[in-house]
From Swiss-Prot:
GO terms for molecular function: ATP binding; metal ion binding; protein-exporting ATPase activity. It is an enzyme of class 7 (translocase). This is Protein translocase subunit SecA. Its cofactor is Zn(2+). Pfam families: P-loop_SecA, SEC-C, SecA_DEAD, SecA_PP_bind, SecA_SW. It comes from the Bacteria. GO terms for cellular component: cell envelope Sec protein transport complex; cytosol; plasma membrane. May bind 1 zinc ion per subunit. The gene is secA. Gene3D superfamilies: Helical scaffold and wing domains of SecA, P-loop containing nucleotide triphosphate hydrolases, SecA, preprotein cross-linking domain. Keywords: ATP-binding, Cell inner membrane, Cell membrane, Cytoplasm, Membrane, Metal-binding, Nucleotide-binding, Protein transport, Translocase, Translocation, Transport, Zinc.
Length: 925
């Protein structure tokens, strides 16, 4: 109540921000007459003037009014479009590291040019991030005319581009590309063996288009570069038959023993997206596996040697119970291709991880491809948080404002519309069955068709869109279908969707990137005419003129019929996706309407609100085919959606908390790798590692602060001779001295090792040996980092079980992952020292060849794949990583700290605990 009163007096935070921005808008508008007087060359010359002023110390904020005015004037001349005042506000929001929420049709693409131009003045690069290659190329070509006019270079970063073209794109002032490609390039840059092979510059400023889709919807799916692992394709084929022999249990057993409607061998947790075997199911599965010879007679599925079989069995159960053809994936060209649940697009080249994709391939009878080993991985959260400045824009972000602030520190600012919105959002209609719902949808579509009103029907799956298409065919209603299967015709279908009597069925419209203009999109249709090779220039001009004349009458006709009507056939689990569908109507103050038709069979209602709504229907004694249309029901559904959104937020937050630990380690490894790549001579680094290893060996046999009688000198001499080829007369030295300090013995060992090493270097020359040292270090870092990623993955999959021992899984993960990381550094140190110290050299040429073979072996890994991982809460553990003993871990940490670049005592601890290093793992040293 008090909050509401304060808002009335002072206005909301959003209103106060908009008011501040309007003051700057007035300054920009006042500059317009001044820049209108400039010639094209003088206007272009302003970019260089701004650059010089910025180099002289003037901030971007001080340049903003003039830069925005120049950009607007250039847009008027080149694009024939003048930025509205609300677009100027949007540009300022983007420059201030915030998210601009702008309604569909308000011109987000043009708005971004203001902030892009201003930040490109620094020369440090601006990345404009889109959801697919088509939009990246389209926007770069479209807006590139404006940037080129202003003297700025524009590049496009597409997948499968040649290396030189990628480098050129990144060296441009402005680079357009997809979130996946930017992320994969970062990972690839940290796998190169030559600094000149890197493509990215330091990450400066990024504007993320459809920011909610990229930073929220895709945040549960890390980017992964992987290579082939051990071949187990036959096992997937054999496991595929088992789910068919098991019966599904209906209902989940509660604590009091009730809840099971029909007993079975496994039950499906739709909320958690998991499958679990019942006790009877375990016994039956063990019996089947025993008959197939996969486990021994009387053996348990939980025996250590059978853990892998358990993993494959659960993958097969999930493939059969939770993943459905034409909803979650399609089958094309002997491949299973994932369908993006948020946009309905095909995600070619991406694969589910954890053996799930192979299980689906076995289920569908296509070729089962080998499992992969992770070579490099990063989440979008941690990639985008590396930019100095980050901003975003979308039509729907306000519902996720808390998450943007919490995870990314990005505030959402809702930008006012240029003209008042006129769309009418009607109450949801809820039916008892799916058939009743589709009958009502068809009636609504027919009514619109007869009145000449265009309709856009939104569905949540390919299966639904094709079913509805069949119903409309039966009713002889002409229509277009836009789903993952018709991806190639997407732009053409959307361009026509606003014409009178047009019926368009589409799987989720999120990120489609094309406006639906009432009367049809003249620009798009003109583009298709321009691209037609069969028409002469005169015919093209005549057809375009005819199109423009027709458009005005069609536009008025559609407006009179009520504008675009949106029909939703099901509520998505995210309110934001529903809002994106609704947002297709009523652009730029046009009329429009929307309505959702639901049934009690819908997944969202069935899981979260079905019983409550069914009870209301029964209480009201609703006759067959009669819908409920009441605010209380709509509120129940929105409450269910909020529950799902909250749960998904918790999953993303949990993923981030785990990935933050790996991220700190990733930064350290990549920093070490880059130091090795860029060092003129890695000799000093190798010497430090060698000395650290020898100190450890020495202290194993000659502990500090001990008496001479406690020293194991003969054992030390043996280890030095056998492992390192060093003959050091330690016993003889002790006998010949009246008293001796242990440090003197250590110095003797160090001196002998240095002499032997210097002798090897002298044989081939410092330059040749330095190249070999560099190759060995890079090989060791890469190999052990890959193994470490696999260990972290296994650790995370089983860590939730620690909760049963009254331990905090997150803290346990942080502790054990740090111990694993200390062991990783120790392994790198020992391997580099052993290989470089014991290498047998005959000639410089031989050494050079060895270096080349090492680099070639690692830089040409077979069957590299780029994919999004699937992260689901509560995945079955595959194989818990063995927990390093605390004593060994302490020693490993000590060695690692001695041999690797040191963490400052007051720096944050790399384990991710949030404590200072000296108060956490620094105590080990």
């Amino acid at each position: 109540m008090i909050t509401g009163l304060l808002k009335k007096v002072f206005g909301s935070r959003n209103e106060r921000l908009i008011k501040q921005y309007r003051r700057t808008v007035a300054q920009i508008n006042a500059l317009e007459p001044k820049f209108e007087q400039l010639s094209d060359d003088e206007l272009r010359g302003m970019t260089e003037t701004f650059r010089q002023r910025h180099a002289g110390g003037e901030s971007l904020e001080a340049l903003l009014p003039e830069a925005f005015a120049v950009c607007r004037e250039a847009s008027k001349r080149v694009m024939k479009m003048r930025h509205f005042d609300v677009q100027l506000i949007g540009g300022m929001v983007l420059n201030d590291n915030k998210i601009a929420e702008m309604r569909t049709g308000e011109g987000k693409t043009l708005t971004a040019t203001l902030a892009v131009y201003l930040n490109a003045i620094t020369g440090q690069g601006v990345h404009v991030v889109t959801v697919n290659d088509y939009l990246a190329q389209r926007d770069a070509e479209w807006m590139g005319r404006l940037y080129n006019f202003l003297g700025l270079s524009v590049g496009v970063n597409l997948s499968q581009m040649p290396h030189d073209a990628k480098q050129a794109a990144y060296n441009s002032d402005i680079t357009y590309g997809t979130n996946n490609e930017f992320g994969f390039d970062y990972l690839r840059d940290n796998m190169v063996y030559d600094p000149s092979q890197r493509v990215q510059r330091p990450l400066n400023y990024a504007i993320v288009d459809e920011v909610d889709s990229i930073l929220i919807d895709e945040a549960r799916t890390p980017l992964i570069i992987s290579g082939q692992a051990e071949n187990q394709t036959d096992l997937y084929q054999r496991m595929n038959g088992i789910p068919k022999l098991l019966e599904r249990q209906i209902g989940e057993e509660k604590a009091d023993g009730t809840g099971v409607e029909k007993p079975g061998d496994y039950y499906v947790d739709e909320k958690g997206h998991q499958v679990y075997l019942t006790e009877a199911g375990h016994e039956k599965a063990e019996e089947i596996l025993s008959q197939q010879g996969l486990i021994g007679e009387g053996e348990s599925l939980y025996a250590p040697q059978n853990i892998t079989l358990m993993h494959h069995l659960y993958a097969a159960l999930r493939a059969h119970s939770l993943f459905h053809r034409d909803q979650h994936y399609v089958v094309q060209n002997d491949e299973v291709v994932i369908v993006d649940e948020f946009t309905g697009r095909l995600m070619t080249g991406r694969r589910w991880s954890d053996g799930l994709h192979q299980a689906v391939e076995a289920k569908e009878g296509v070729t089962v491809q080998q499992e992969n080993q992770t070579l490099a991985t990063i989440t979008f959260q941690n990639y985008f948080r590396m930019y100095n400045k980050l901003a975003g824009m979308t039509g729907t972000a306000d519902t996720e404002a808390y998450e943007f602030q919490e995870i990314y520190g990005l505030e959402v600012v809702v930008i006012p519309t240029n003209r008042p919105a006129q769309r009418k959002d009607q109450q949801d209609q809820i039916y008892k069955t799916g058939k009743e719902r589709y009958d009502a949808v068809v009636r609504d579509i027919r009514d619109c068709y007869e009145r000449g009103q265009p309709v856009l029907v939104g569905t949540t799956s390919i299966e639904t869109s094709e079913y509805l298409s069949g119903l409309l065919d039966r009713e002889q209603l002409p229509h277009q279908v836009l789903n993952a299967k018709q991806h190639a015709r997407e732009a053409e279908i959307v361009a026509q969707a606003g014409r009178p009597k047009m019926i368009t069925i589409a799987t989720n419209m999120a990120g489609r990137g094309t406006d639906i203009v009432l009367g049809g999109n003249v620009e798009k249709q003109s583009g298709f005419i321009e691209a037609d090779p069969n028409l002469s220039d005169a015919e093209k001009a005549a057809r375009i003129k005819q199109l423009e004349d027709e458009w005005h009458s069609l536009h008025e006709q559609v407006k009179a019929a009520g504008g675009l009507h949106i029909v939703g056939t099901e509520r998505h689990e995210s309110r934001r996706i529903d809002n994106q569908l609704r947002g297709r109507a009523g652009r730029q103050g046009d009329p429009g309407s929307s309505r959702f038709y639901l049934s009690l069979d819908d997944q969202l209602l069935r899981i979260f609100a079905g019983d409550r709504v069914r009870a209301i229907m029964e209480r009201l004694k609703m006759p067959e085919g009669e819908p409920i249309e009441a605010g209380i029901v709509t509120r129940s559904i929105e409450s269910a959606q909020r529950k799902v959104e909250g749960r998904n937020f918790d999953i993303r937050k949990q993923l981030l908390q785990y990935d933050d630990v790996a991220n700190d380690q990733r930064k350290e490894i990549y920093k070490l790798r880059n130091d090795v790549l860029e060092a003129q001579d890695v000799g000093d680094m190798v010497t430090n590692l060698r000395e650290s290893v020898l100190v450890e060996l020495f202290r194993d046999h000659v502990p500090a602060d001990t008496m001479e009688e406690q020293w194991n000198i003969s054992g030390l001499e043996t280890r030095l001779r056998e492992d390192w080829g060093l003959e050091v007369p330690l016993a003889q030295t002790i006998e010949g001295a009246q008293s001796i300090e242990d440090e003197e013995l250590l110095n003797l060992i160090m001196k002998a090792a240095a002499e032997r090493y210097d002798g090897k270097v002298a044989m081939v020359g410092r330059e040749s040996f330095a190249g070999f040292e560099r190759s060995v270090m890079l090989q060791s870092i890469d190999t052990h980092w890959r193994e470490h990623l696999a260990a972290l993955d296994h650790l995370r999959q089983g860590i939730h079980l620690r909760g049963y021992a009254q331990k905090d899984p997150k803290q346990e993960y942080k502790r054990e992952s740090f111990e694993l990381f200390a062991r990783l550094l120790d392994l790198i140190k020992n391997e580099v020292t052993r290989v470089t110290f014991n290498v047998q050299i005959q000639s410089p040429e031989e050494l050079e060849q060895a270096s080349e073979e090492i680099e070639e072996g690692l830089s040409h890994l077979e069957n590299i794949q780029y994919k999004h991982d699937e992260f689901a809460e509560g995945r079955e553990p595959v194989e818990e990583a063995p927990s390093p003993r605390t004593g060994a871990a302490m020693a490993a940490a000590e060695l690692a700290l001695a041999g690797m670049p040191k963490v400052g005592r007051n720096d944050p601890c790399p384990c991710g605990s949030g404590k200072k290093f000296k108060q956490c793992h620094g105590r080990l040293s």
